[in-house]
Structures are given as structure tokens and as C-alpha cells.
A protein has these predicted regions:
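Short alpha-helical catalytic segment bearing the HExxH-like zincin motif
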Residues: 105-113
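Active-site rim/adjacent substrate-binding subdomains
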Residues: 1-105, 117, 123-126
């Protein structure tokens, strides 16, 4: 899970400073972030659905991975529904002040959630600066 970096922030700010990005443009940013992944990683994500949620999600959540990380799968893992990565459009825009910041935060959030698919937990991501 990727949470807002502001300690204690449990809801989106209502200060009129939230940048607005059209849904289609935001989705393009997510696609660009995914396209920026190395080809080898992309091939290992064939059974992962990446979606954008345009309504506010759980408080403070930028992205969410739901599924069984590759490191936890056994030989019995088969026939499962795709894992899912959700990127929360309103939450990301709420912490950004410029379009460039939105692009960078989308990229960081996508990489963060993809890392969970590969079995990297939040503690290790924090150690790595993600």
C-alpha cells in the first residue's frame, strides 16, 4: 500500500489547492509508468490488472496491491483471478501542486505497488527510499 507521506493526514485536503487532472490524462500517466518498467518485469505481470479509481478511496491511500505476491506462490497456485493494483487518482492529485509532480507521484506509486507484486514489503521499500 502506498499512503500519503504526510503524517496524520487521514483525509484529502480541502484547501482549494488540489491540482486537477482529467481522468483520461491521469490514466495515460499510469500507462506511461507501466511502460517504463523493464520488459522482463512486465512479462512477469501478465496476470495483474492495473486500474485507476477516480473516486476517493480509503483515507490516505495512494495505491493498493491486492493479490498473492510472486514470492508467496507455491506450485499449487493456479486458476486464480488476476492480482489487482489500484491507483487512486484523487489522493495523488491531492498531494501534488504541479502536473510534473503528479507524473512523478504516479510513477512512484505504480512502482511501489508493482514491488508488492514481486514480494517487496513496505518496510523494505522504505529502506530503499520508495
Amino acid at each position: 500500500m502506498r499512503y500519503l507521506p504526510h503524517a496524520g493526514l487521514d483525509r484529502l485536503p480541502d484547501n482549494g489547492l488540489v491540482i486537477e487532472v482529467e481522468a483520461a490524462r491521469f490514466e495515460e500517466m499510469v500507462v506511461m509508468a507501466l511502460d517504463g518498467l523493464p520488459d522482463e518485469l512486465g512479462r512477469m505481470m501478465r496476470n495483474v490488472a492495473v486500474t485507476v479509481e477516480h473516486e476517493p478511496g480509503p483515507p490516505g491511500l495512494l495505491g493498493l496491491y491486492q493479490g498473492v505476491p510472486l514470492t508467496n506462490r507455491t506450485s499449487n497456485y493456479a486458476g486464480a483471478l488476476p492480482d489487482r493494483i489500484t491507483i487512486y487518482h484523487p489522493a495523488i492529485c491531492a498531494i501534488c501542486r504541479t502536473p510534473a509532480q503528479v507524473v512523478e507521484q504516479v510513477r512512484r506509486t505504480v512502482i511501489h505497488e508493482v514491488a508488492h507484486h514481486f514480494g517487496i514489503d513496505d518496510a523494505r521499500l522504505d529502506e530503499l527510499g520508495w
